[in-house]
Amino acid sequence: MSLKVNILGHEFSNPFMNAAGVLCTTEEDLRRMTESESGSLIGKSCTLAPRTGNPEPRYFGLPLGSINSMGLPNLGVDFYLSYAAQTHDYSRKPLFLSMSGLSVEESVEMVKKLAPITKEKGTILELNLSCPNVPGKPQVGYDFDTTRTYLQKVSEAYGLPFGVKMPPYFDIAHFDMAAAVLNDFPLVKFITCVNSIGNGLVIDPANETVVIKPKQGFGGLGGKYVLPTALANVNAFFRRCPDKLVFGCGGVYSGEEAFLHILAGASMVQVGTALHDEGPIIFARLNKELQEIMTNKGYKTLDEFRGRVKTMD
């Protein structure tokens, strides 16, 4: 039996990686991810200049997940480029970098810096079009004209295969519209579904107060709250974008949720809230649990069931 994934010119020992935003800000974070039993890792969504992010408290654990409004805290693109060029041990596992420019011009400037490193090292770009927690900055992925502009400019500036991280969609028409845009850009090779469900509100009934400070308490939901929405988005884009890969993200706490993401069409599976809660040791457990499910079902490889979810039509 094998959990290996061969995509994007790389071999991954298994489909698991962190979600951009969790255990990936500092060099120590990235080292811990590299030494874990994940198949890959991704850096923190970065901006041109370092950001401290939103005021604290900005993350709050919940019974079924989390709410956060981090505001893209990161060490700035040059730190992550330096890590990719000089520090990361590519013999251990491939590396993704996440970039989240605050404008299309900023995104273009960052990907131009990354391009020579990608050519030399094989670093993979995930372009974040879906951060819901920067005050005054709407999510690019909910404006299809702006999404098209970003993809056009980044494709021209970068000139290499890359992926996009998308917000969750909730309307069939929006699946169709987003897929139509993505399918126009052959350099977009993978679609990560989904970022957190934006602008939830959690209130503590004891003190009648919101639980995070930014944006009057509004923040992105993660964890088990997200799983059905994430699976729907993974499957919707898997069906609509047959020439692209889909990465699943949302609600993965065990091998079973990972199995469901792959069944819906995911090639890689990103872990966020559960990784935040459990630490990088989680990947050993996820691998073991996914293997047990495959053994019980008689599957030898991930390809045997990827995207094979049965419908009742």
Curated annotation (Swiss-Prot):
GO terms for cellular component: ciliary plasm; cytoplasm; glycosome; nucleoplasm. It catalyses: (S)-dihydroorotate + fumarate = orotate + succinate. It is found in: Cytoplasm. Binds 1 FMN per subunit. One of its GO terms (molecular function) is dihydroorotate dehydrogenase activity. Keywords: Cytoplasm, Flavoprotein, FMN, Oxidoreductase, Pyrimidine biosynthesis. This is Dihydroorotate dehydrogenase (fumarate). It comes from Trypanosoma brucei brucei (strain 927/4 GUTat10.1).
